[in-house]
Amino acid sequence: MIKHNKLIYLLLLSPIVIANSNVEEIVTTGSLINNSEKDASPVDVVTREDFENFNILNFAEISKFLTSSSGSHFQTNALEGVDQGMASITLRGLDHSSTLLLLNSKRHTFAGTPSNQGQGYIDVNIVPEIAIKQIEILKEGATSLYGSDAVAGVVNVLTQKDFEGFKLRINNSKTANYSQSDKSLGLLMGSNYKNGNYVFGLNILERSALSA
């Protein structure tokens, strides 16, 4: 009877010994440097309501209302250079390739032609102003996250993905002496389905020459 008890005892212990042999060592490395978990990068948000209040005709014109922007590189009526009709937003007074433009938090390809200085940039005119939901502007360098094209900051454009219906906007504006005029047409339409949706946006801007 004693021999049988010893055999049962060994059988019960054997699985426990095997399980313990598979345990791996875990090493946790920490830092003693004090920091605040509430620290955040400075981000400006421009909503759809802000766009209506600014009364702007295209995305590039938003740069006139950003405190961290050096303006937009806009050459609609230029007579020289290779990038007429294109536009880019630059932050902190740096060149065009130092500000990263994201469309719905995703990268986009550069414009087909470089700037007059040979720099590659994203043409913001590809984004219909009427389809923009809001814009997020990161006002400091983010090269550790996005690379060297985010030295000056990041501009993230969010579009109206869930728009349903039809929207048409026509605008005609002139200078005080009628020497220059802007005519714009904006179209936005969308519909939601059971398994998805679609949104179509279009902006057309015709700007006449400014008489000196």
Locate predicted features.
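Short, polar/charged loop or turn motifs at beta-strand boundaries
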Residues: 41-64, 89-94, 120-125, 172-176, ...
